[in-house]
Amino acid sequence: MANVTVIGAQWGDEGKGKIVDWLADRADAVVRFQGGHNAGHTLVVDGTTYKLSLLPSGIVSGTLSIIGNGVVLDPWALKQEVEKLEGQGVTINDDNFAIADNCPLILPIHRDLDGLREAAAGTGKIGTTGRGIGPAYEDKVGRRAIRVCDLEHLDSLEPQLDRLCAHHDALRAGFEEPPVDRERLLGDLREIAPFVLRFAQPVWKRLKKVRKAGAKILFEGAQGVLLDVDHGTYPFVTSSNTVSGTAASGSGLGPGAAGFVLGIVKAYTTRVGSGPFPTELDDEIGQRLGERGHEFGTVTGRQRRVGWFDAVLVRQTCAISGVTGIALTKIDVLDGLDTVKICTGYRLNNNVYDYLPSHAASQAAVEPIYEEMEGWSESTAGARSFADLPANAVKYIQRIQELIECPVALVSTSPERDDTILMRDPFMD
């Protein structure tokens, strides 16, 4: 049996939470390997809605859930999320939850810097969630980060704080802000340390043991490949690598552990915040899709931008991330449309492109080339087999498969976990 790596193959918000939850029932461990609490998952299990932004989706079903070293961890946000889930009856303890002891922390000073920069950016805003993710990754790469393991050695933290605060004090001075309150920061860390340390361990070692026992591991990506710091629509991206290869470096297992790479893809396209969006719809159809799809961010509450399915982008993300098969979500949102469209190429300066150029100005200027297909009036909501789908919906799915050059493994027809059509079992591949 294979391990499975789940990634978003668009700009995030593709419905990864439902798919991961559906797969987590059969996994022995679920691992978050990048990002922070800036990307949310909404799970609906037996009529109960769970909103997660940091914890792996497997925690709801009691599966061993791990936050890997590739994640930047806000310990206060984690505590709040754990307490909220426990209030909903979810059991969280050191038997079913672990945090990498070499995981870098998001501190209040990171949130401060994030907000100051975005406020000063004016029209140049990149749409950050303001939760300190980017600045925390900067400190990680700059070798200034305070990590989970440091919480056990707070009495000897002064040299690290010197280096960290010298950097942030210089930045804060540029915004006419006072220096970091070191005593308050240290006090905050002392207060939160016992909560975090009860879950801290070398998770690479635990995962090695789990894998050696023949267990199935589910790697849960956050956001989407089009937000990858290298391969996304730069600079309108996140601060981490969101491609499947990060599952190795962000968990401590080798690249051979990734297994079946499942790319999650909406049957249309959405994006939160600024940045290029070739198929964006500003008309009544776009408004209808947004309303029917409840397109509001789990974390920020911001309304998502909506557009037609972009086969060019998904073909590109599937290639970059080595996607084995896709899970197509929210097909039911397209029910009732007379016509559906798929972007098959771009036009730019009298040239036709079968990929998205790297330069930001070119990305913003491309014009989509559409292929139109007949829609369907029948409902796809709740369908659990291909035979339950309208003929035109089947044709739409098959055409997507052809254009992105990657097979469809799953189709999701509602937020409910069991409303899923399985064509190819990722764990059996």
Curated annotation (Swiss-Prot):
GO biological process, any: IMP metabolic process
Biological pathway: Purine metabolism; AMP biosynthesis via de novo pathway; AMP from IMP: step 1/2
Cofactor mode of binding and number, as noted: Binds 1 Mg(2+) ion per subunit.
Binding-site positions, Mg(2+): 13, 40
CC cofactor: Mg(2+)
Gene3D superfamilies to which the protein is assigned, alphabetical: Adenylosuccinate Synthetase, subunit A, domain 1 (3.40.440.10), Adenylosuccinate Synthetase, subunit A, domain 2 (1.10.300.10), Adenylosuccinate Synthetase, subunit A, domain 3 (3.90.170.10)
Pfam family, one: Adenylsucc_synt
Positions annotated as active site in the UniProt record: 13, 41
Entry binding sites for GTP: 12-18, 40-42, 304, 330-332, 412-414
Binding site for substrate: 298-304
One GO MF term attached to the UniProt entry: adenylosuccinate synthase activity
First-tier enzyme category under EC: ligase
Keywords noted in UniProt: Cytoplasm, GTP-binding, Ligase, Magnesium, Metal-binding, Nucleotide-binding, Purine biosynthesis
Protein origin, superkingdom: Bacteria
UniProt keyword annotation of Cell membrane present: no
InterPro entries: Adenylosuccin_syn_GTP-bd, Adenylosuccin_syn_Lys_AS, Adenylosuccinate_synth_dom1, Adenylosuccinate_synth_dom2, Adenylosuccinate_synth_dom3, Adenylosuccinate_synthetase, P-loop_NTPase
Positions contributing to IMP binding: 13-16, 38-41, 129, 143, 223, 238, 302
Main localization, broad class: cytoplasm
Family: Belongs to the adenylosuccinate synthetase family.
NCBIfam families: PRK01117.1, purA
Role: Plays an important role in the de novo pathway of purine nucleotide biosynthesis. Catalyzes the first committed step in the biosynthesis of AMP from IMP.
Assembly: Homodimer.
Protein name: Adenylosuccinate synthetase
Species of provenance: Erythrobacter litoralis (strain HTCC2594)
Name of the encoding gene: purA
